[in-house]
Amino acid sequence: MGKKKKKRKSSAFKIILNVFLSIFLVAGVAFGGIVFAMIKTAPPLNVQQVLTFDEPSILYDDKGQYMDKVITNEQRIVVDYKNVPQNLKNAFVSIEDERFYKHHGVDIKRFTGVILINVTNKIKRSSKLQGASTLTQQLIKNTVLSSEVSIKRKVQEMYLSIQLEKELSKDEILGAYMNSIFLGGNALGVEAASKQYFNKSVKDLSLIECAFIAGVPQSPSVYYPYSSASKKNPSIYLNRTKTVLYKMLDNGYITQNDYNKALKDLDSKKLVFAKPSAPSNKLAYEWFSIPAIEQVKKDLKTQYKYDDKQIHNLLVNGGLKVYTTMNKNLQDKTQNTINNAYYLNSYKSNGMIYPQASAVIMDYHNGEVKTIIGGRGDQPARSYNRAASYNYLRPAGSSIKPLTVYSAAIDSKKATAATGFEDSPIPNNIGRKYSSGAPYNPKNSPDIYYGYVNVREALMRSINVVAVKLVDKIGLNTSIQYAEKFGIPIDQHDRSSIASLSLGELHKGTNPLIMAQAYGVFGNNGTYTEAKLYTKVVDRTGKVLLEPKTNTKKVLSPEAAFITYDMLQGPVSESGTGPQANFGNMEVRGKTGTSSDMKNLWFCGLTPYYSAAVWIGNDNSSTVDGVYSSTAARLWGDIMKEFHVNLPYKQVQKPASVVTANVDRISGKLPTQLSYRDPRGSTVYNEFFINGTIPTEYDDIHVEAQINKLTGKLASKFTPSFLVESRVFLRRDYSPGVELLDQQWLLPYSIDEGGSLPPTEEKNNSNTRDKNKDKNKNKNKDKNPSQDKPNNNNNDNNSNNNNNNNDNNNNTKPPENDSNQNHEDNKNKQ
């Protein structure tokens, strides 16, 4: 019986043992299968991914110098392993992975010990759990895997760590770890942490500073020295630092003396942190960098079809190198010039300096923009970019005239530089075309009218009514077409507004970047070159992602471009509106602009090297006091002077197809003998023309008549012969209703002692000279209005014949005629 019982017990034990062994075997096989499945679904190990870190893109200037870095919420500065002090390397190994140089990716001894400790803590219901990740595992987690807490992720982490140890050396792994680890605040990597905490490079860290940084990864928020808890109780991070130092001593990385001195330094409060600062969200060269980044975004979307999220990630984390066209030296000088322009009559309001000013300078030959200044004085981050933003557009005033009026008329061959107009109030039959109510009747400012002028002089003096008459002649549609060719934003309101197209009273407006591109056409044979803000974008591997071509389009014929360029010397002449723009002996061309009520002041122009535009105004669109468009010309000249230092004199070359001819500056027609006998001197000069546009008719404004030289009246049969004198006059067959400055040179209507008028004038017998002088009698104001009667006047700015200046015939020096320009504008030509 006893033996049978023993046999039964033994048999039962074997059965139970076999069952348990079977269970364990099945469980082991199952567990192994699960682990194998987890490993099989692990992502492939990409060593390059491990060694590549998220970095913001960097912008460089046109000389390859560092300029700006794309702003991110976190800062990383990748540092070379050889520049990391040995103390910091040893500190990380001591506190994070003391058997780092012995294991092959996974520390089995530590892993087993941690499991036992964590199981014990669970049984005791303790919340204290320990981690067993090696530095290699942490690197895999930071660069390849997500931060998900799961058995699957842990198994994959261990597997990939073992694989990584086969591919990289220990130094490469440790170096990658120190560049990838989060170290509190905004710091990713040891270099960013060193800058954040101690305002120094990592290579300059002391032993206690190294120990502090190595202690942070365990709990970055707890050991953050700028937190309120740490400020109240510094022992939180000091004790952690001492623990790191002890581990370094225990592992033989520092001596007992080093350890003792380090503790003494900590107790003596020698662990000093830099003053905390909020992360800046302002770029160093914000005016230029933001438009450049926007252009890169646009091109990435066009070329690679990336969506906005992909583009954002690439710029923020992709470590791109963006080589811009900005010249840092000239950008700094231009900013300084605008900030310190004492003649801007500056004042402060709500901490901001006013008036504000902006400028753009570009090489119109290749489109490279060299300077963008979006404002003056201290500005908050992402402030108005008054130079380049399409959200900050302002009316251009008369600076639009060369674009939508004069070059448009010449290029379309509907007028020439010599075409004559009468500077006099707009006739009602024209005014009614552009107004449903009272006739449109813009005025010169102040109320001065020159009488007969040609197109060249009208541009020089910026005469408003002539610009309106010329747009009426070429048609709104033609003017609109050229505005769009030049890149001027035109909306539906502008399309039906002659004020927008002839006087620059645009509904939305323009900005200096738009105007600098447009004015470059005149020096570039009529070719518009699109602004280019960068030349190349390279990814972190050195591959060129973007290399934009120079985009151009034809706007004007070379002939029309050159003739307009030549005409633009008028506004910067002493008789023009902006002579202050001149500097040195450089060839300068340009045009002032003033919008209504002196709210926006402009100067746009070019040299044979660069085109540039300057704007002055207030952000609230209020009147700018004590500053004029001539001030904008002065600022333009001061800026451009710096751009042309050591550049040789140069000229824009005249196309061979541009022809010249002698014409009468009063009528714009071929001269007669009377043209040489104008009472103010010869009105014959040599003008540029597009071939085929030289006038064929002869001057009909000058007339000759015999007068009584004593009374100035027309001679008659009653006039004594010794008082009869033959003189040359100007004819005007109607009364303009206002006094014109050339009125004193008109053919007299009064007859000496009775008699009859010359036969050609009999039709105007009712219009006597005395009636013309009476400003209060305007019965004949709209009788026979002369819309496009060929006229002319002084043209001292023509490059081929600058004689016969008529300015000396009047004591009153005429002011600029920008829309509502204050008469004081001309008093400020300093």
Curated annotation (Swiss-Prot):
Return the Gene3D superfamilies for the record: Biosynthetic peptidoglycan transglycosylase-like, DD-peptidase/beta-lactamase superfamily
- Note the SUPFAM superfamilies from the entry: beta-lactamase/transpeptidase-like, Lysozyme-like
**Which EC numbers characterise this protein's activity in its record?**
2.4.99.28, 3.4.16.4
> By its UniProt entry, which InterPro entries does this protein fall under?
Beta-lactam/transpept-like (IPR012338), Glyco_trans_51 (IPR001264), Glycosyltr_51/Transpeptidase (IPR050396), Lysozyme-like_dom_sf (IPR023346), PBP_transglycosylase (IPR036950), PCN-bd_Tpept (IPR001460)
Compartments annotated for it: namely:
Cell membrane
Q: Looking at the keywords, is RNA-binding present?
A: no
What ranges does the record give for the region Transglycosylase, renumbered to this chain? Answer: 57-229
The protein's matches in NCBIfam families, at most eight in alphabetical order, are given as: PBP_1a_fam
Q: What does this protein do?
A: Cell wall formation. Synthesis of cross-linked peptidoglycan from the lipid intermediates. The enzyme has a penicillin-insensitive transglycosylase N-terminal domain (formation of linear glycan strands) and a penicillin-sensitive transpeptidase C-terminal domain (cross-linking of the peptide subunits).
In its UniProt entry, what is this protein called? Penicillin-binding protein 1A
Provenance organism? Clostridium botulinum (strain Hall / ATCC 3502 / NCTC 13319 / Type A)
Gene for this chain:
pbpA
